Amino acid sequence: MSRENGAALDFTINIDATADLDLDTHHAEALITVQSSPGGTSAPAGRIAEVLIMDRSLSMKGQRKINEARRAARAAIDALPEGALLAIIAGNERAVCVFPPVQGLARIDAEVREAAKHAVSGLMPEGGTKIGQWLAEASGLFLADPTAATVRHVVLYTDGKNEHESAAELGSTLDACADQFICDVRGLGDDWDHVQLRHIAGKLHGDAEAVLRIEDLAGDFTRLMRRVQLIAVPRTYLRLAPNDAFRITAVTQAYPVEVDMTQHQRPGGGTVIDVPLGSWEERETRRYQVSLRFDPAAVPTGEKLRAVRVDLLAEVANGTRVPCANAPVTVFRHATPGDPTTIPESITQVHDQREIGLAIRACVDAWLNGRNADADAELDVALRLARKSRDPRLPLLEDIAESGPDGKVRVRGALTPGEMKKLGLDSFKTALPSSHRPPARPEDQPAGQPPDDVDKAGERAAGPAMPMAAGQACGICGEQNEPGSAHCVECGNRLRGRGVA
């Protein structure tokens, strides 16, 4: 479709849904699989605008950290193509643009490249950490090139916690920056906040990773600069237009990284919502889970009904959003009591993967807060769930596990906080079914991480629909939820039932 609409990629949408609904149920789910392929116009997209944010707070002093950070920044500068736009921010409790010397972005040529590398060489650590201030400064710099086709990208690293601004202040900045640029974030060493970095990356459509060895930062930055050059469409949107009888209660990116996108949605007119999806490369696959609620009295029985129209929109060079693909979410409500709702295997897998991630994060949180018995118990749950479903995160769990004197699983000794925080970030990573999972690209696969099959993925899972068993009631609002649900569809409360055999 790209030849007609001006987008650089073609997109396809496939949908699995809880299509056969129990007469008494009042909610449904859909799993939307979006795939990109080379389109009619040449990729990549327009020029790149890159902002490097360097943490220069006092905690960067010692252990060669500031020297390696300078080396990483120079490597990133060398990896950017001629003609790209560049700025460099040095951040502590203030954000200072150290390059270019005048406000805005500099177009890279040989002279600019050398000047930029010289600018980072004199940075010395001092002061505290105020990440929201850094991101706000980057947002202002991008105003120098508001062209819709420009790929606006930020790389941010930090080795500490955001101690000089409140969570509300950071949240306000993230809301203002959302859909304005992509931000990849990196945590160095042991003292950063993995929950905070995952939140930043999720809000700004980037990746959050741990760099445990500071000397690996330069290679990581080089990979990021090469990756940004592969972006073909800078901004895309999932438009969800529900039938009048339905309302959307939650939207979650389910693959390749789990991200709650419910708060990302923007009004699209009437009951329609647009969910920003960020940028796309060729041959990417992503999955989005949509939760729906309806009044049974408003949905007829015995006939197929379109619950939601799904459109994928891409922003093209003139700034308009053009439709690239669409598909319906259809449901069928049984007329006879006792006919069970059926759940496609692909949706069951999403629930299973989410439960594993929740158990891993509970383990990490307990360990970091000194609750070792709780950490051991959550690790045991995560291991059993991962083994049962052959989850790709299983090797990561086995790497931190050992048997105690009583024969029970426990978190092994000699782990560092950085290693556990890395596991916390990796817990959000999910996979396609193994039968459709291609090998990762070697240059994009950091050591010790789950398979990254973002770039080349096959068809969606096509398993048989599974009957829904008795649900579990939410302890907060009393809502009955499907088995395997991680959160209540009505109030969002975490459901603790795991049902491990």
Task: Label every PLM stretch briefly.
Residues 3-235, 297, 391:
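Exposed acidic/Ser/Thr-rich ligand/metal-binding surfaces
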Residues 294-489, 493-501:
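Long, acidic serine/threonine- and proline-rich intrinsically disordered regions
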Residues 22, 39-41, 97, 247-249, ...:
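Intrinsically disordered, low-complexity acidic/polar segments
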Residues 23, 281-283, 481:
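Surface-exposed coil/turn segments at beta-strand junctions on protein surfaces, enriched
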